Swiss-Prot record:
Spans within the Extracellular topological domain: 16-764
Gene: glp-1
GO terms for MF: calcium ion binding; RNA polymerase II-specific DNA-binding transcription factor binding; transcription coactivator activity; transmembrane signaling receptor activity
Gene3D superfamilies: 3.30.300.320, 3.30.70.3310, Ankyrin repeat-containing domain, Laminin
Annotated compartments: Cell membrane; Cell projection, Axon
Lineage top rank: taxon: Eukaryota
Pfam families: Ank (PF00023), Ank_2 (PF12796), EGF (PF00008), NOD (PF06816), NODP (PF07684), Notch (PF00066)
UniProt KW keywords: Activator, ANK repeat, Cell membrane, Cell projection, Developmental protein, Differentiation, Disulfide bond, EGF-like domain, Glycoprotein, Membrane, Notch signaling pathway, Nucleus, Repeat, Signal, Transcription, Transcription regulation, Transmembrane, Transmembrane helix
UniProt protein name: Protein glp-1
GO annotation, biological process: cell fate specification; cellularization; cytoplasmic streaming; embryonic pattern specification; maintenance of dauer; negative regulation of stem cell differentiation; nematode larval development; nematode pharyngeal muscle development
Consequence of gene disruption: RNAi-mediated knockdown causes an increase in lifespan and a moderate increase in aak-2 phosphorylation. RNAi-mediated knockdown in a rsks-1 mutant background reduces the formation of proximal germ cell tumors. RNAi-mediated knockdown results in abnormally large oocytes.
Repeat positions for ANK: 961-990, 994-1023, 1030-1062, 1074-1103, 1107-1136
Length: 1295
């Protein structure tokens, strides 16, 4: 045991603590350790003080070590152990152990000869473990559950384990144990532990509950609801929450009542004395009306709201026209109305009435010439502003509100912005701002002087004076460390799989149980087709905290949608008494200061005063509101959107008027005839006239523009997509029902498309013209078909690519502009969310446009995070399965009609009738039988097909889409019919207009049974790697799709001769050629099972496509977490760069997958660290492994086994060089060969790497040895951990 501790004292600093870098950099080691530069260049290690351990001495050890010992951790940061303290001198152990020994000798006394070259592992002595040779012997490192000198002892105890579902059984020598997933505990992981799942219930508490599918439930705090208590409860929906005609406003986790004057309290239930501060002049006195409003009773001879107007001498009354010399009311001279009383000849009215005889309702009466600021109506030091023909408006100071600023404001959770705390002192509120913010409401973010307040923890100080923090840090100077709860994300992600959210995704229905960021918001069904948090550094965290009433600074940025505006004060509402006034004056060119703030839409930008502004246009939203209602309330709707976005919002327009269209639930219809003059009077129309327009629950489709008055570097929204994402995130919070307080169902960025048809043409004229054009086109097509004849076996269309030239800057700019002509964010509520549902449009559809719709989509569709995926190039035809273009034939041919119908055929079946051709679809009877969708039984279809074949039907006849009956049978999953057609000579190698054969159709349909039958045809086996129009083989099509039998189908194709790493090289001259293999497509679609199968079959993990991207790069770009982890942990190269000189980590970062980028950098750093350790070990003669090890002496001598070059059986790859003849000293560079490629470090796959695992151990220390074996039989299987090459030294021993 003492020997073991001595060994650990030497080995721990060498193996587990050698890092890349130098001691000179800040924070190389923590304050609990001292840094020493390593023997190798740019390496260092940390010597820890007593009581501390870890690679950087950052962890405090809780073991009570004896005197002369200290505590360390193993290389995994676990298993603390007491070892001897370091020697007093500061000489690194690597130098102490190597001093004085001659070359070829080592050991404490420099007398031990080093490795002689005999390979003792040739006989494979380790039964259930790995054999590692060294001088004079070998060591066996046993697998879990096995022991003994030769790993011969032990059994698999996991065969009959009782571990709960989701846990992992780990075998040991005498038993097994269950490795529990996050949130589970117990011997068999049978218990749910809420404490292990982090803050899984955001605003509530977690309670174990076996009746739930997740085995726990959340009990929400007051004001919150939802499965995970992350949704605000709208208390205002409860009847009479606020009383006395007050207005209820929902807040996050709470609500507030805006009381009518005269009432106070949380529910406005308390009547207050409004006369206390209400002064009536000239001996008038104050009273309350029925609404608790203060009114003044004036002495005769005075009038006015506060008795401030003196009437001419001898006159009185409210108009100063009542003679005071004679009584005005009496029994004979008239009475007082509305319960007024006649006192001393004049009427004294009830508080709600006024007039000389109390005949006027007070609320309908206005005193003459007093609705202006000259009478000082505003109180509490408010600023009064006269309104043109509308009276006045009071701008209240902090802490007051109301018509005349007479009401005191109460503190609410959202009174102060950016996490400030509100406190009320003597009726006046004050915001205490956090560090980095200032202003009355903490609404101003202070700029930092970088020289005085440098950014910490790796943050970067920008020109704006703000710090851009690294992942895991936040705060004005990045001083705060975030606690990222991976356990919570893991639990929810597992829940998504358990609920089969992938099957429910993109079906047009928002399923609340899948409305989580980890479930992609039900495939976009709950987010209007968007991925709103795709750019956010903390997507799951910020989606969870979005609009929850708590300011989270790490989410308070444009990429994370400003935390749902939680960090902004909610006091910005347009006062009711000037709301109409401000709507009428928005954007009229005159600055109305009373309207120039957030709540009233910044007066339409009129108070800009030359300040810079940014205008974001082409924001397309669908709103479930009646078009007629919107015609009347357009200005009010725009005001509401403006207030919620905190920016000016206007409707775009073109030369025909406002861009407002009807929406029938599926398509964008005709333009809504808005009253342009009225809207212009309201100034809710854009100032910019667009010269073209576009078209896609009923309602309207609006095209909006958002104007923000700001300098560009300080604007909240830099792109229109950010506004769309904010709207989409609001949809998420309501399960897809509304956003911005409106019933919005979808938002996207879309440029209205130019309407090429003359607006003056009628609909019937357009249809007539289209029909004529179609008939002419059909005649030409029929002539071509008749000329070429039906005897061709295939139709292949080769597209020759133009010669590529380096794009100029102007060309790139033009390309970016033109990109807007395709689609922004395709709606996931549409069937064409990711691809068109039909494999090919029928020939009759060409006249009506794509899918028969009037409008096209604008920006590239996305596969993952809101950025164009690799399937979205303009020339990529992403297509799926197809169906018959019509239920019934166009011609009334009896045999065709009966073949396509539900009943059996009764018409005569003759050689002439079975070969009769439909004039429109060019189909024959076999086509209609194979494509029958009318419910005809399968056995009847097969029997009738046999009868037609016997009558002489052409089995290989093709319709206008070049489809044979076999292709249609394959699409319809008709196995029996497919077998009959094959037996009768159907050619499965014929290609249709989509350039697909029956093989492609079968794999697209995921039909394993038909695939097995097709692969019995020898003609098809010879063309098993044929490409479709997108340059994809059947294996590639299988690899990209998820499904129950996909892996089995891929294995079947490979067993029948499909090439594993074929990249479509036969189409290199085509613009469809991408240079990708099946592994590329499996990786980019996160098909983990397929990736595992292909990698195990030795598919080239580092094959680069035409863009220089490897499978792991494509997976990183699309955010495929599981695939990236598997490839990275199975030695896929992380140092290769693509044509843009970007590594996999940089590709992930550019696509806003920050966590993936951090993971890839961690793995790359670990590899770099372990490579340095191995080199150090090799130089010092040490290479031990952890585990149960046994050393046996080998007395026989022998010659060294000559290393042989591993012959590669892969396809030749023009971008991926072959191994350098087995040399481990100078591997071929595996990166994209561009003129600017300057990778810091070459990296190769294990097949081409020097095998450091063969470094030979000796009995005492490690010494320099000759080059080790390069025998693939003794390769170490990479473990499933990020520390895949790390070596655990603590606990190892040799005998």
């Amino acid at each position: 045991m003492r020997v073991l501790l001595i060994l650990l004292a030497f080995f721990a600093p060498i193996a587990s603590q050698l890092m890349g870098g130098e001691c000179g950099r800040e924070g190389a080691c923590s304050v609990n350790g001292k840094c020493y530069n390593g023997k190798l260049i740019e390496t260092y290690w940390c010597r820890c003080k007593k009581g501390f351990g870890g690679a950087f001495c950052e962890r405090e050890c809780d073991l009570d070590c004896k005197r002369g010992e200290k505590c360390i951790y193993d290389v995994y940061g676990e298993n603390p152990t007491c070892i001897c303290q370091d020697c007093e001198d500061e000489t690194p152990p690597t130098e102490r152990t190597q001093k004085g020994c001659e070359e070829g000798y080592g050991g404490p006394d420099c007398k031990t000869p080093l490795f002689s070259g005999v390979n003792p592992c040739d006989s494979d002595p380790c039964n259930n473990g790995l054999c590692y040779p060294f001088y004079g012997g070998f060591q066996c490192i046993c697998n879990n559950g096995y022991g003994g000198s030769y790993c011969e002892e032990g059994i698999d105890h996991c065969a009959q384990n009782e571990c709960a579902e989701g846990s992992t059984c780990v075998n040991s020598v005498y038993n097994y144990y269950c490795d529990c997933p996050i949130g589970k505990s117990g011997r068999y992981c049978e218990r749910t532990e809420c404490a292990l799942m982090g803050n899984i219930c955001n605003h509530g508490r977690c309670i174990p509950n076996r009746d739930e599918d997740k085995n726990f439930r959340c009990v929400c705090d007051s004001g919150y609801e939802g499965e995970f208590c992350n949704k605000d409860k709208n208390e205002c929906l409860i009847e009479e929450t606020c009383v006395n005609n007050s207005t209820c406003f929902n807040l996050h986790g709470d609500f507030t009542c805006t009381c009518k004057p005269g009432y106070a309290g949380k529910y406005c239930e308390e009547a207050i004395d409004m006369c206390k501060d209400y002064v009536c002049q000239n001996d008038g006195y104050c009273a309350h009306d029925s609404n608790q409003m203060p009114i003044c009773y004036c002495e005769q001879g005075f009038t006015g709201q506060r008795c401030e107007i003196e009437c001419p001498s001898g006159f009185g009354g409210i108009h100063c026209d009542l003679p005071l010399q004679r009584p005005h009311c009496s029994r004979s001279n008239g009475t007082c109305y509305n319960d007024g009383r006649c006192i001393n000849g004049f009427c004294v009215c009830e508080p709600d009435y006024i007039g000389d005889r109390c005949e006027i309702n007070r609320k309908d009466f206005k005193f003459p010439d007093i609705q202006s600021c000259k009478y000082n109506p505003c109180v509490n030091n408010a600023t009064c502003i006269d309104l043109k023909n509308s009276g006045y408006s009071c701008h209240c100071p902090l802490g007051f509100y109301g018509l005349n600023c007479e009401q005191h404001l109460l503190c609410t959770p959202t009174t102060c912005a950016n996490g400030g705390t509100c406190e009320g002192v003597n009726g006046v509120i004050r915001c205490n701002c956090p560090n980095g913010f200032s202003g009355d409401y903490c609404e101003i973010k202070d700029r930092q002087l970088c020289s005085r307040h440098p950014c910490k923890n790796g943050g970067v100080c920008k020109n704006t004076g703000y710090c851009e923090c690294q992942y895991g840090y936040t705060g004005p100077t990045c001083e705060e460390v975030l606690v990222i709860e991976k356990s919570k994300e893991t639990v929810i992600r597992d829940l998504c799989e358990q609920r089969k959210c992938m099957d429910l995704a993109s079906n047009g229905i928002c399923n609340p149980e899948c409305n989580l960021e980890e479930c992609n918001f039900d495939g976009g069904d709950c987010s209007g087709g968007q991925r709103p948090f795709s750019k956010c550094q903390y997507p799951a965290r910020c989606a969870d905290q979005f609009a929850n009433g708590v300011c989270n600074q790490e989410c308070n940025n444009e990429e994370c949608l400003y935390d749902g505006l939680d960090c902004q004060s909610e006091l910005f509402r347009c006062p009711a008494h000037i709301r109409k006034h401000c709507i009428e004056r928005r954007g009229d060119g005159v600055c109305n200061l009373e309207c120039s703030f957030i709540g009233c839409g910044f007066d339409g930008g009129d108070c800009n005063n030359g300040t810079e502004a940014i205008i974001l246009s082409d924001i397309r939203i669908k709103v479930q509101i009646d078009p007629i209602e919107f015609q009347a309330t357009g200005g009010e709707t725009l005001m509401q959107i403006s207030a919620n976005l905190r920016a000016t919002v206007r409707i775009q327009r073109d030369e025909l008027g406002p861009l407002v269209f009807r929406w029938d639930g599926e398509h964008e219809m005709e333009r809504v005839e808005m009253n342009s003059s009225k809207l212009e009077d309201q100034f809710v129309l854009s100032h910019h006239v667009r010269r073209y327009r576009q078209a896609v629950v009923t309602g309207i489709v609006l095209y909006l523009e958002v104007e923000e008055i700001c300098k560009p570097e300080f604007c909240r929204f830099s792109t229109a997509q950010s506004v769309v994402d904010l709207i989409a995130a609001g949809l998420v919070k309501s399960d897809g029902r509304m956003s911005l307080g409106l019933p919005i169902t979808e938002a996207m960025v879309a440029v209205p498309k130019r309407n090429e048809i003359d607006e003056g043409w009628s609909r019937s004229q357009v249809i007539l013209f289209a029909c004529i054009a179609f008939l002419a086109f059909g005649t030409v097509v029929a002539g071509v078909i008749a000329k070429n004849g039906p005897e061709r076996s295939r139709k292949r269309k080769m597209v020759n690519a133009t010669v590529w030239m380096p794009p100029m800057e102007s060309t790139n700019e033009k390309g970016r502009r033109n990109q807007s002509n395709h689609s922004s964010q395709c709606s996931l509520l549409d069937n064409s969310a990711y691809y068109h549902p039909n494999t090919k449009r029928h020939c009759s559809d060409y006249s009506t446009g794509y899918n028969g719709e009037q409008y096209s989509q604008i920006y590239p569709q996305t596969l993952a995070n809101g950025y164009p995926g690799d399937y979205n190039e303009l020339n990529f035809d992403f297509q799926s399965e197809t169906f018959a273009p019509a239920d019934l034939p166009a011609d009334e041919i009896p045999l065709h009609v009966q073949a396509a119908g539900p009943d059996a055929i009764t018409a005569p079946i003759t050689n002439e009738s079975v070969n009769q051709v439909d004039s429109k679809y060019r189909r024959r009877v076999l086509h209609w039988l194979a494509a029958n969708v009318r419910g005809k039984p399968e056995d009847v279809i097969t029997t009738e097909a046999i009868r037609c074949l016997k009558a002489g039907a052409d089995v290989n006849a093709r319709d206008c889409d070049e489809n044979t009956a076999l292709m249609l049978a394959v699409r319809a999953h008709r196995v029996r019919l497919s077998v009959v057609l094959l037996r009768e000579g159907a050619n499965p190698t014929i290609f249709n207009n989509s350039e697909r054969s029956a093989l492609h159709e079968a794999v697209v349909n995921k039909d394993l049974r038909i695939l097995r039958h097709l692969l019995t045809d020898k003609r098809l086996l010879k063309e098993i790697d044929e490409l479709d129009r997108n340059g994809m083989t059947a294996l590639m099509l299988v690899a990209r799709e998820l499904g129950k039998h996909q892996v089995e189908m891929a294995e079947l194709l490979l067993s029948k001769g499909a090439k594993l790493d074929y990249d479509g090289a036969a189409r290199k001259d085509s613009n469809k050629y991408k240079g990708r293999t099946a592994l590329h497509y499996a990786a980019m679609h996160d098909n983990e099972e397929m990736v595992i199968m292909l990698v195990r079959r030795s598919s080239n993990k580092d094959k680069q496509d035409e863009d220089g991207r490897t499978p792991i790069m494509l997976a990183a770009k699309e955010g495929c977490e599981k695939t990236v982890q598997y490839l990275a942990l199975n030695d896929a190269s992380l140092g290769i760069v693509d044509s843009m000189d970007m590594t996999a980590a940089q590709v992930a970062e550019a696509s806003y997958h920050h966590e993936l980028a951090a993971f890839l950098r961690q793995v790359a750093n670990e590899r770099h660290r372990n490579d340095i350790m191995r080199q150090q070990i090799v130089k010092s003669g040490h290479g031990a492994k952890s585990g149960r090890q046994t050393v046996k002496n080998i007395k026989r001598a022998g010659s060294r086994k000559t290393p042989t070059s591993a012959a590669s059986s892969r396809e030749t790859n023009h971008l991926t060089p072959p191994p350098s003849d087995g040399s481990f000293s100078s591997p071929s560079p595996h990166y994209y060969p561009t003129t600017t490629s300057t990778p810091n470090r070459m990296e190769t796959s294990p097949e081409y790497m020097f095998n450091h695992e063969m470094a030979p151990p000796v009995n005492a220390m490690w010494y320099t040895t000759p080059p080790p074996y390069q025998d693939p039989n003794y390769r170490h299987v990479p473990p499933n951990t990020a520390f895949q090459n790390a070596e655990q030294m603590n606990g190892s021993f040799y005998c």
